[in-house]
Amino acid sequence: MAGSTSASLQTPYFPSSTQINPVRVDHTLPLPPAQPSLSFTQGLLVGQLSVVLLIGAFIKFFIFGEAPPPPSRGLSNRTSTHPRSYSINAASTDSSPRLLREKPSTSNILRPVPSSSTNTRSILRKTYYSATPTHPTPKHGRPRLYHSSHQPESLDWFNVLIAQTIAQYRQTAYILKDSPTSSILASLSETLNNPEKKPSFIDIIKVTDISLGEEFPIFSNCRVIAVEDPNSDGGRLQALMDVDLSDDNLSLAIETSLLLNYPKPFSAILPVALAVSVVRFSGTLCISFVPGPRTSDQTMSPIPTPHDTTSEAIDDQSSDQSSPAQNPDGPKDAHANTSNTTDASSKHGIPKTSLAFSFLPDYRLDLSVRSLIGSRSRLQDVPKVAQLVEARVQSWFEERVVEPRVQVVGLPNIWPRMGRTGLRSSQEEPEAGSGSVEIPVMTSPGTDGVSGGGGSGGGSGGGGGSMRGIDRGLSGREVGYEALRFRHAACGGHQNQSGRDGGRGGNEQFAMPGSMPDTVTET
């Protein structure tokens, strides 16, 4: 029994349908994770340091960073080609450095300006202006002008300034029209009747009509060029600009008489009336700065004493120079002050910088000349008279402001001084503007010879406004700004009527400005 049991244990019985699968042992067991080279503390420190660096970079480049400057006048494109040099502040290489404790001499306190920083090329380089300098190739006695490669300027801002200046001159001339010494009428009459220039066969010239115009000149196409000048080291700069004035009523009318003094004085008298108007003017204006005439060419005044060169004396001279504008009733004092200022400016033989302007010969000046010759049988608009007047005006203009002749004007002293200091407030501007606009209508009695419009309504035939070509219904403000035109005639003579006597009654007759007194006959 025991033997059978052991035999059964050694040889187990398996059913035929049961299969034994072999057991497979996997030897690729997962390895334990590798230990990190940095500890937790070290990683924390590295992370905090990275965050601090990022925050610092953000603050530096985004919060405290400088924004790039906006491009202005194309300076970014010109900086590389026109590097700025500071030759005035830079010390010369051959001179030894001066110690700060070393006391400078009284005659060498002001640092000298190098000639290389004041010549033409240095000025153009430092102002980033491209211009082609000229070469001494004379043409008709003048150096040839080369156009600048720089973009021309429009000069819109300059037109506004010039228009304001001209408008102020027109307003001042109209306000002072009744002044016996400061009016433009008195100045023209004195100039036309100069005994040194007026021939003996011409009678007294009477100004009958003046029109200062309503339009303003338009400047454009400004360019700066370099011109060779033997009187200036390195040449000089010249600004060329186109100017055009058209559709304006700038005119002057006069009347006089031609005297026949043979065989006896005043044997015959031929009345003549002329009216000259500027239809259009266009040309090229040249402006440059030139040194003024030296004292050797002028009448020198005595050398002033040292106390005259102090700041108080200079302030007194500046106040004296502005006194003629404040005191128009004192022409003698104004002339004396002007002469004193001129003498003071020419002391020590030092030339003063002046502004020179002229026009190129290719200008255009169109005139309209109307004439009336005779007393009873009259000739109107004679072509030969118009040609003579136009030729004379053209010659007068060319002899003064056409190249190579220039007009030289001394520059005013613009150094700030307390004598010229003013105060501008918001309350004073409206008052000043209203005060300048209100211009009263100037009337004249019936016996005076003011020509132009007659009285309105029941006014007399000779009385009325002093403006020609303006309706009676205009107020004083409109009269002052419409045309700035006024008339003048001698007292006690016949009045130049325009057919508007006594409230526009009867047939209206018209006459040319500056015509003879009996041009129009009453019906």
Curated annotation (Swiss-Prot):
The SMP-LTD domain is a barrel-like domain that can bind various types of glycerophospholipids in its interior and mediate their transfer between two adjacent bilayers. PROSITE patterns: SMP. Residues 1-43 are lumenal. Component of the ERMES/MDM complex, which serves as a molecular tether to connect the endoplasmic reticulum (ER) and mitochondria. Components of this complex are involved in the control of mitochondrial shape and protein biogenesis, and function in nonvesicular lipid trafficking between the ER and mitochondria. The MDM12-MMM1 subcomplex functions in the major beta-barrel assembly pathway that is responsible for biogenesis of all outer membrane beta-barrel proteins, and acts in a late step after the SAM complex. The lineage of its organism: Eukaryota, Fungi, Dikarya, Ascomycota, Pezizomycotina. One of its GO terms (cellular component) is ERMES complex. Residues 151-412 form the SMP-LTD domain. Residues 74-96, 105-118, 295-312 have a biased composition (Polar residues). The keyword Transmembrane helix applies. Its main location: endoplasmic reticulum. Residues 65-523 are cytoplasmic. Keywords: Endoplasmic reticulum, Lipid transport, Lipid-binding, Membrane, Transmembrane, Transmembrane helix, Transport. GO terms for biological process: mitochondrial genome maintenance; mitochondrion-endoplasmic reticulum membrane tethering; phospholipid transport; protein insertion into mitochondrial outer membrane. It comes from Paracoccidioides brasiliensis (strain Pb03). The chain crosses the membrane at residues 44-64. It is a single-pass type I membrane protein. Residues 70-118, 295-349, 420-473, 492-523 are annotated as: Disordered. Residues 449-467 have a biased composition (Gly residues). Homodimer. Component of the ER-mitochondria encounter structure (ERMES) or MDM complex, composed of MMM1, MDM10, MDM12 and MDM34. A MMM1 homodimer associates with one molecule of MDM12 on each side in a pairwise head-to-tail manner, and the SMP-LTD domains of MMM1 and MDM12 generate a continuous hydrophobic tunnel for phospholipid trafficking. Belongs to the MMM1 family. This is Maintenance of mitochondrial morphology protein 1. InterPro entries: Mmm1 (IPR027537), MMM1_dom (IPR019411), SMP_LBD (IPR031468). It holds the Pfam family MMM1. One of its GO terms (molecular function) is lipid binding. It is found in: Endoplasmic reticulum membrane.
